[in-house]
């Protein structure tokens, strides 16, 4: 019996299935995360879906290879163990980010979805654990905005009739609420305001895109994964590849990683460093 092809590479607790030299398979980001994990740097646990999956996805009429979903579920279970939380669990929920990762850097050309796993069942526990209702509803409205834009509109191939996409329309809803309240900054919005916005956003998404924002964590996850693969052939990415001479057949990896938050308060932040 032939050995099943490995499509998912874990990094957690100072160990990694991959190596820093495996950029062709894991993409630059995935290879870097694997190497940092091996070096003992405190990297939040996650896993990388290989560039091979992207290649097979497009070869097979945008269908995933056999065994991928089982490998993702197996890797997620290991991430849950490493983080002491469970994806979709109503008591100790794990949230993840879903990011692209080509072997050569393509900054801003492909898609990202953050806060994946926030649902009506996990929000109460996140509020209880963080003791910060405002942060949780801010994360939730960001998820709705990002997911509607990246997954439900762009990846679905929906072209806005008036040229204004769903993200622009949701931003207008937020700006209108700020004007009504006399606020100057997004940070002026209260927990109640953000909860109200999340409800408004979901209604707007349903009205414009004719679909409900998903309340199932795994539907959110696979929507995000698919959107990253779709973004490899998005207009921006295709144009960038032509300019930079990046071959189409390289494909992108997908990195699913435990969330790190930069919006929990004035002493919280995230960023990108270049060396």
Task: Describe the residue ranges of each PLM region.
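Nucleotide/phosphate-binding sheet-loop regions of phosphoryl- and nucleotidyl-transfer enzymes
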Residues: 1-275
